[in-house]
Amino acid sequence: ACLEPSMCAEMACQSAHKMATSETFSGLSPPASGATNIMFDPTEHPHRRYNPLQDSWVLVSPHRARRPWQGQQENVDDTPRPSHDPSCYLCPGNTRIGGEVNPDYTQPYVFPNDFPALLPDTPEYRSDDPLLKSMAVRGTARVICFSPDHGKTLPELPPAVIETIIATWIQQYRELGERWRWVQIFENKGAAMGCSNPHPHGQVWASDFLPNEVARADDSQRRYFQANGRSLLLDYVERELKERSRIVVEGEHWLAVVPYWAVWPFETLLMPKAALPRLMDATPEQQKDLAIVLKKLTSRYDNLFHTSFPYSMGWHGAPFGQEDTAHWQCHAHFYPPLLRSATVKKFMVGYEMLAESQRDLTAEQAAERLRALPEVHYREAADR
């Protein structure tokens, strides 16, 4: 028993301080550097940011943006391409690698991928071995040629043509969603992203399972909705509209931002301003506005370094075959690798592969640079 309450309190305080000191130097909480009078500045000091969609963190190191670069540089060929290339497997009227002849299409053209990653008739198989677990999967894969023009990428197409691409995406969702649980629409633009053919095109992969990224996004949005009674991404849109420091393009119905938790240098997240679980639920007005926003966003990308800006982009929305979709909000991710110029890209290696994602430029700095650029494509501006 303690005879003096004040002494007991002092002893307890000393004990707590000793425990805290022990924890500090055992690595649980690193000791302060001693610079206690320096205020934290997110534009100068390293910090972590949380991605609520993926339940993951990214290390932000803005002080590293000044480091010199003597590493690999990309080869850039920005020579304008012809509207039709006789040797291209995707141009109208040409023969594809498998021997099929493309029609003389004038709108977006969809055909089965000649080298699909998924097959619809895979035999049943499942192993529940705790160390060697596996399962057979089924699916299908298609290619979408955006237009017959071999030389014009998405930002160089007029909004009316981009609307036909959006309509094609929606048609693919409706058709493939009747059978498959997940339909992934995406585009790999540019050789830096592994694009195997320069003719502007995207892909559709449909599967009977939820891929990892989607499963995590589904779980995160569901948990947020259950805890708050609201959509995670709708709340996030409201926050971005209020703060405005990360907005790149704003339309009547759509908003493109560099997300607070961005990993890639000029990564963007494209979201509707109103509840929209799937892109296929978009109204004609929303589709029209989306075409305008897509053109403005991708034009800013190209204008950043006056080059055809490489990226991987793709759409996420509520999976098919489930009635519970209130927690979902459709959105598109743009993941571009370029960092300092048209020839220097970010590499996901070392720490990023072994520990966690890391970036130098803050999301706010990246958004400011993109936002300040003209929304008219540099080639269109030169032709005026």
Positions of the model-derived regions?
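Short intrinsically disordered, low-complexity coil segments enriched in acidic
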Residues: 1-4, 67
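Active-site microenvironments that recognize anionic phosphate/pyrophosphate groups
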Residues: 23-28, 32-199, 205-277, 299, ...
